[in-house]
Amino acid sequence: TFANNAVEAITGSPGIGLTRIAFRQFHGRNTEIHVADFDGHNAKRLTLDNSIAAGPEWTPNNNTLYYYSYRRHNPDIYSHNLQTGARRTVARYSGSNISPAVSPDGRRLAMVLSKAGSPDIWVGSANGTGLRRLTTTKEAESSPCWSPDGRWICFASRASGSTRLYKIPANGGAMSRIRTIGVVNATEPDWSPDGRAIVFTTMRGGGVFEICIVPPGGGNVEVLATGEDPSWAPNSRTLMFTKRSRGKRVLSVLDVPTKRVKTLPRSFPGNCSQAAWTK
């Protein structure tokens, strides 16, 4: 398409003109999941929970979204087929059931469950069965994401006191820290589709959030922009993230090599955050 070709001509990377995003939008005290084209057009509200719905995550075929919702007064994980509208419960245990992350082959789901005590990383099949607990720390784990080869899960943990990045084999094993030199707290990791980098959020003094990037093996951190909630586009060059502008949360696009930031051509009413790009 023209849009895809134009993006590729400018960036040298495959276009994103046909991609879509899912995100949460604030409606008073509630948040609902919405979907739209990556530029903000053709927006559609997906959930009508009149509650808190958050953490959208696409399946690789882009026809189903996972998210969690408080619609039953407890954070539970759901899958939502965008073609049929069918919604099913994936994880509904006592405590928190949040942060679903789909494996690259679409067959497995990582999530944060607190049914055994503190919030830990668990992995199960895509429908939530066959659960296996990966982390057993006494501290809170959060924000799991998969390596593109499906072998590793990266996440944030307070196991060492401050929140830092770790990885663990998806089939079980020891967790190891990903060094983020120059940053003392790191959360919300997202592994690039080409496997070359992990972006994450850090909080500086004064409550300022920054988007940073680090090699998957750890190392020096580069600050990309002020913001939070980073999500890679399929081209491993472009990020969607949340920027605070004039007291409002807006979705913005970042070209990683040039660090150029643009707000979406079509903005949404109200605050928006937690954008997730199609695979």
Feature roles, as predicted:
Residues 1-279:
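Sequence signature of WD/YWTD-type beta-propeller architectures
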